[in-house]
Structures are given as structure tokens and as C-alpha cells.
From Swiss-Prot:
It is a multi-pass membrane protein. Involved in the transport of copper. Keywords: Copper, Copper transport, Ion transport, Membrane, Transmembrane, Transmembrane helix, Transport. This is Copper transporter 4. Belongs to the copper transporter (Ctr) (TC 1.A.56) family. SLC31A subfamily. It comes from the Eukaryota.
């Protein structure tokens, strides 16, 4: 018959056992909390980066990198929408060209998702500056992509109208109210 294991002794502040300060096989103590902090001593994406070694300058470089990653993710999102629109409008094109467009759209989507996950992991550093840089990057990328400054026509209303017209035409209907049958 098996004997039950004894409970560990309570910690200094209550009933819970003391938390380990180091993971087995790790040389660094676990000091990251689960609440947002302010300060330049953050670890973002890689061990000891930007960390404490280079001061505030490396921290600002880290914030600029997170901002750029988030802006690029938004720009790729706009490019993905543009590729989807091109695919919808190119039903009459050759099969080989359509397949290339589909592969390109899949590649853009994969790159966008990879960047989005990197930004998410950076925000998981629980540094408020990194969070603000990510939000600012997404906003800047959205603004640039929608304003057409990146050379994308995906934001232009006439393109959206053309896509709706192409979809309506392929369904056999028309968007113009005067072309509806009269009762």
C-alpha cells in the first residue's frame, strides 16, 4: 500500500509553499512579473536584449524595431487585401497566372502572420513601452496603407466599388438601380 506524500512546508507569508526562484537547469533566476512595467530594463524577443547592458539607447532601438514590425504587419495586411482583390477580378486570366497569384498571396499571408506573432511575443514582455510602440506601429501602418502613401490602391473607394461590381456581374445582377426589373 502506498503512503501519501507529505505536504511541503508553508511559505513565509501564508499557506502556499515558497516559489522556486530558478528553473531546473537554468542559470538565470525568474524575475519577470505578470504585470506591465515601465522602464528600459526589459527583455524583448531574445535573452538579454535589449536588457541592461546598453542603457536607454538600446531600449529605444528595441521600441523602434517593434514599431516597424507592427507597421510592416499592417502594410502586408493591405497588400494581402489587394492581392485578394486582384484574384477576384482575374477570373478570366490563365490558370497558371492565377496559381502564381495564389502562391504570392499565401506567401504574403505567411509573412504577415509571422510578423504579427513576433509583435505579440514582444508585447508579452509586459513592458508598457513595448505595448505602446506596437499599438503606434499598427496605427502608423494602417494609416500609411489606407492613405495610399505606400502605393497601394487597396484603400481607394473606386477599387472597392469595382470589386463589388465584378462580384455582382458574376452573379448575374447589376448594381445600378435603373436596371432592376419593373413589376
Amino acid at each position: 500500500m502506498a503512503m501519501p506524500m507529505p505536504m511541503p512546508p508553508p511559505g513565509p507569508g501564508g499557506d502556499a509553499p515558497p516559489a522556486p526562484t530558478m528553473m531546473p537547469g537554468m542559470a538565470m533566476p525568474m524575475t519577470t512579473g505578470m504585470s506591465f512595467t515601465w522602464g528600459h530594463r526589459a527583455v524583448v524577443l531574445f535573452p538579454r536584449w535589449p536588457g541592461d547592458r546598453a542603457g536607454v539607447g538600446m531600449y529605444f532601438l528595441c521600441l523602434l524595431l517593434v514599431l516597424a514590425l507592427a507597421a510592416l504587419a499592417e502594410a502586408l495586411s493591405a497588400a494581402s487585401r489587394r492581392l485578394d482583390l486582384d484574384l477576384d477580378l482575374s477570373r478570366s486570366r490563365g490558370r497558371r497566372r492565377r496559381r502564381r497569384q495564389q502562391l504570392l498571396a499565401a506567401g504574403v499571408h505567411a509573412a504577415r502572420m509571422g510578423l504579427a506573432y513576433l509583435v505579440m511575443l514582444a508585447v508579452m514582455s509586459f513592458n508598457a513601452g513595448v505595448l505602446l510602440a506596437a499599438v503606434a506601429g499598427h496605427a502608423a501602418g494602417f494609416l500609411l496603407a489606407r492613405s495610399g502613401l505606400l502605393g497601394s490602391r487597396a484603400a481607394a473607394p473606386e477599387i472597392d466599388g469595382a470589386a463589388a461590381a465584378a462580384a455582382a456581374t458574376s452573379n448575374g445582377s447589376s448594381l445600378h438601380p435603373s436596371s432592376e426589373p419593373k413589376p
